[in-house]
UniProtKB/Swiss-Prot annotation:
The gene is murB. One of its GO terms (molecular function) is FAD binding. Disulfide bonds: none annotated. Residues 36-202 form the FAD-binding PCMH-type domain. It catalyses: UDP-N-acetyl-alpha-D-muramate + NADP(+) = UDP-N-acetyl-3-O-(1-carboxyvinyl)-alpha-D-glucosamine + NADPH + H(+). Cell wall formation. This is UDP-N-acetylenolpyruvoylglucosamine reductase.
Length: 322
């Protein structure tokens, strides 16, 4: 069991006094994640801007755990909470999107994907329509190479600006990001703060039409009005995760307040009172049943983080829990 956030802040008394951002101890992560479930952050820090974030990183000893989140769209937080500091980049300091030349946009890491799509439309830049259908933020899109409708983030990235654990600035090229399917090999210790994107000049009517098609498809096949973290598992080579989940009889499967959506069975939803334990147990149950049915190992696309409550544990799949 972790100590209180107040106790952690007391240990660092004086180190953080010059920060302009907001420090909040013992903040429920259920308030900032789309699943609306999970335990508290020991301390939540919302920096004012990149300079404030750098000062924070320089002040906090490296042995204290630190986790960065964006808008919380693909996070599953365990019920025991998240020890150390959770850094949440705010829209005010990290959410701007601006056109910097004829074909380029610069976006803050806290900008919603949809805002980038809208800015690209306004600038007459094609190649960003897929962001209109991704329920997340740019920082997460950079970290996991988010994609949809056959397009991926890596196709648009020129360079990424980041801070390391010591608060120093790094600029990473597209190659430095080490992109693969739903993955970047950039150091997990780097905190992305902004990105320079490259688009292709296009007709606004064509771009708007492509965005409308993305939105229509999403609303038709995905549970957009539910408390969900988006796609639960990555697609496996040669097949889609939802097909394997469906074949294993897991469409609509429930554990406590968690359910695999009837509309799209690769979407896990909180039906109202799910705990983090419910959600993760459901996911591992699905993985086990899919493996038993087809021999395919599904890999989580949703990021799981935090501590289990005392006495709780979840076995990894491979038939151990079913």
């Amino acid at each position: 069991m972790m100590e209180s956030g107040e106790a952690l802040l007391k240990k660092l008394d004086g180190r953080l006094s010059g920060l302009r951002g907001r420090l909040t101890p013992d903040t429920g992560m259920d308030k900032i994640t789309w699943f609306r479930a999970g335990g508290p952050a020991q301390v939540l820090f919302q920096p004012s801007d990149e300079e404030d974030l750098s000062a924070f990183l320089k002040a906090v000893p490296e042995e204290i755990p630190l986790l960065v989140v964006g808008i919380g769209s693909n996070l599953l937080v365990r019920d025991g909470g998240v020890p150390g500091f959770v850094v949440r980049l705010s829209a005010k300091g990290f959410g701007e999107v601006e056109q910097v030349c004829d074909t380029q946009l610069r976006a803050g890491a806290a900008a919603p994907d949809k805002r980038v799509a809208a800015a690209a439309l306004e600038a007459g830049l094609a190649g960003f329509h897929f962001y209109h259908g991704i329920p997340g933020g740019i920082g997460g899109a950079l970290r996991m190479n988010a994609g949809a409708n056959g397009v991926e983030t890596r196709e648009r990235v020129v360079e990424v600006r980041a801070l390391d654990r010591k608060g120093e600035v790094h600029v990473l090229s597209n190659a430095d990001m080490g992109y693969a399917y739903r993955h970047s090999s950039a150091s997990p210790d780097l905190i992305f703060t902004s990105v320079l994107f490259e688009g292709v000049p296009g007709e606004r009517d064509d771009i708007r039409r492509a965005m409308d098609e993305v939105q229509h498809h999403r609303e038709t096949v995905q549970p957009v009005r539910e408390k969900t973290g988006g796609s639960t598992f990555k697609n496996s080579e040669g097949t889609s995760a939802w097909k394997e989940i469906d074949k294993a009889g897991c469409r609509g499967l429930r554990v406590g307040g968690a359910q695999m959506s009837e509309m799209h069975c690769n979407f896990m939803i909180n039906t109202g009172n799910a705990t983090g334990h419910d959600l993760e147990t459901l996911g591992e149950t699905v993985r086990a049943r899919v493996f038993e049915n087809s021999g395919i190992r599904l890999h989580w696309e949703i990021k799981r983080l935090g501590l289990f409550r005392e006495g709780e544990q979840i076995e990894e799949f491979l038939g151990k829990i079913v």
